[in-house]
């Protein structure tokens, strides 16, 4: 098994394709490469008879695991989302230098966590993986006090068509950090 843990998008995809070409299973930890090249890499892995998968543990894979659980219990997925603690869409690699230095992080990577880039990549992976969509470009991302407050911010009777799941995120929800899935079941 080969693990792709590079932060280089093209290099990560090339690594995975080379591993697949050598009949190695691939666990991809590079969500950016997975978003852009994942469907192609999966098709190549299937042709070769090996496994290509995302690593469990990042938001998009934890969301998918929750979806698998609620669907096993007989629920239909209505919304899948991320609980983001902080978002500054004006952040950039230069402005984030002091914060990145405190955390010993790469400036571009830290900016991507702060400006919503990473959030959008993860939610695009979820949407592509489950056939979901956003309600509006960029998602809503309301501020909520508690995760259960999301029912006050999303009118699911208007947003959800009964079939296609929605992806979105909430800001500053309690408990901090994490992911959520809203399911529906009409059985008592």
Language model: regions and residue ranges:
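Redox-cofactor binding/interface segments in oxidoreductases and associated redox assembly factors
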Residues: 2-4
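Rossmann-fold NAD(P)-binding glycine/threonine-rich loop
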Residues: 6-22, 29-51, 55-57
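Generic structural signal for well-ordered, non-membrane alpha-helical segments
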Residues: 9, 34, 38, 59, ...
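Short secondary-structure transition/capping segments
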Residues: 15, 39-42, 65-67, 90-92, ...
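Hydrophobic beta-strand scaffold residues
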Residues: 26, 51-52, 77, 134
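Rossmann-like NAD(P)H-binding beta-loop-alpha module
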Residues: 45-47, 53-118
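C-terminal catalytic/substrate-binding lobe primarily of soluble NAD(P)-dependent oxidoreductases
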Residues: 99-188
